[in-house]
Curated annotation (Swiss-Prot):
The keyword Ribonucleoprotein does not apply. Part of the ABC transporter complex HmuTUV involved in hemin import. Responsible for energy coupling to the transport system. One of its GO terms (cellular component) is plasma membrane. PANTHER family: HEMIN IMPORT ATP-BINDING PROTEIN HMUV (PTHR42794:SF1). The gene is hmuV. This is Hemin import ATP-binding protein HmuV. Its EC number is 7.6.2.-. Belongs to the ABC transporter superfamily. Heme (hemin) importer (TC 3.A.1.14.5) family. Residues 2-242 form the ABC transporter domain. Signal peptide: none annotated. NCBIfam families: PRK13548.1. It comes from Bartonella quintana (strain Toulouse).
Length: 264
């Protein structure tokens, strides 16, 4: 479980996160949504240890601030919104960066095959010897997801759930590969792991999320199931535009349809 208690992040005089409290459980896909500047990526950075915060954050009962880096790496893998590599890596070398924490939990022969298996999962089976910097933005994003998979290949290790922390994992992808990524995330959760993902696509969020958290101006505006969070009133208040919500025929999933030129 990820548990956040009274999390605050301040930059200069600006309060980015303001007393955030929530829980995300393993075996579930939790999605954070909200407008730009609402604090979504800031929360991910706090959880991954990139930025300081006040309050308490725990992952599987371990205090994020006081747990050793390698111990955290064995429990969770982070896919940041933006990734910059300083060296001219080949694709298989980038993916293999995720292997180090698995060297004591997975047999050596299986470990050697993991990068290729991970690339197959994201639809890049033949890309191993290509130069990472020559790939498109969407292809690079999928390579980074393969790295995440290498790091936490087994959703549960020694009876402890592992976590995917994904910050806008489908931002640069076409619809086919958006679905590939979201299916990987959902299957990881179904196998006992935990997934916390930041998404902007409200309809994909509605389809895949077991729990949704809507942020507005650094605070949790509401949380719960998709049908609880994705209401016309909630979305209009958070996004300041008209976002009518209906249900798809023969489905119990909300559908959000933005209206052109109807900003509030």
């Amino acid at each position: 479980m990820i548990e956040a208690v009274n999390i605050c992040v301040q930059r200069g005089k600006k309060q980015i996160l303001n007393h955030i409290d929530f829980q995300a459980k393993s075996s579930a896909l939790t999605v954070i949504i909200g407008p730009n500047g609402s604090g979504k990526s800031t929360f991910v950075k706090a959880l991954s240890g990139e930025i300081p915060y006040s309050g308490k954050m725990t992952l599987n009962g371990h205090d994020v601030t006081h747990t050793k880096t390698y111990e955290m790496a064995a429990m969770r893998a982070v896919l940041p919104q933006f990734t910059t590599l300083a060296f001219p890596f080949l694709v298989h070398e980038v993916v293999a960066l995720g292997l180090s924490v698995n060297q004591f939990t997975i047999a050596k022969k299986q470990l050697q095959n993991l990068p290729q298996k991970a690339l197959e999962c994201v639809g890049l089976a033949d890309y191993g010897n290509r130069h990472y910097h020559q790939l498109s933005g969407g292809e690079q994003a999928r390579v980074q997801l393969a790295r995440v998979l290498c790091q936490i290949w087994e959703p549960v290790c020694n009876k402890v759930p592992r976590w995917m922390i994904l910050d806008e994992p489908i931002a640069n992808l076409d619809i086919q590969h958006q679905l590939v990524v979201m299916n990987i995330a959902r299957n990881f959760a179904r196998c006992g792991g935990g997934v916390l993902a930041v998404l902007h696509d409200l309809n994909l969020a509605a389809h895949y999320a077991d729990k949704m958290i809507l942020l507005k101006q650094g605070k949790i505006y509401c949380e719960g199931s998709a049908s609880t969070v994705l209401t016309t009133q909630n979305l209009s208040d958070a996004y300041h535009c008209s976002l009518p919500v209906s249900e798809l025929p023969k489905a119990d999933t909300p559908f959000v349809l933005p209206q052109t030129a109807s900003f509030l």
